[in-house]
Amino acid sequence: MATSDILESLIEKDNGYLITSKAVESGVSKPSVSKYVREHDMEKVAHGIYILDDVWPDELFVLQQRNKNIIYSGETALYLHGLIDREYSHICFTVPTGYNATHIKKKNKEVRYANPEILDMGTCEIPSSSGNLVKVYDKERCICDLIKNRKKYEIQLYQTAIKEYMSSKEKNLSRLIEYAVKLGVRDEVMMYVEVMV
């Protein structure tokens, strides 16, 4: 397969993004990527990440491509799952305890830390608002984290997310309770399950 065909295939797969590391993994040299970017007038959105001129930048996708350790959580994940209707005011993500996140702790970013035993519990991939797949916590993990950290959330957001989840046909109560036990919020979660289901 020709270099341009490989790159076009990668761009199509990533919704208009060309990620240098993925191109190199596919056998394309960095100089060939640079040449393609110049010839197709692609815009650089981050180190090693380029987009076509007709593509709107997706901050969540770009941030995660640059930082593979992050998992979207909190308000960001609640919004992506449709559990709250108001877009998140800041990007919230979780990283492993001990991870040095100073390079991404910037305006409108909230970094949370989790122990390795629970870090990957409940991870899944869903489309961002722009349609690119990003790694987030599933609905059940989001609800458990929400209940565990309830004082950090506005009451309206908290109530909306709980109500939306409990009234959803897609809820998985056995998984919710399993996570609640591991996160130490079983009693609080059971209170909502008993009252709202």
Feature map (PLM): residue ranges:
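Short helix->loop/beta-hairpin flanking segments within DNA-binding domains
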Residues: T3-L10
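Nucleic-acid-binding surface
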Residues: I6, G16-K22, I49-V197
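Short, surface-exposed ligand-recognition loops at beta-strand->loop->(often short) alpha-helix junctions
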Residues: E25
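Basic amphipathic alpha-helical segments that dock to polyanions
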Residues: K35-H40
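A short, conserved structural fragment
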Residues: D41-H47
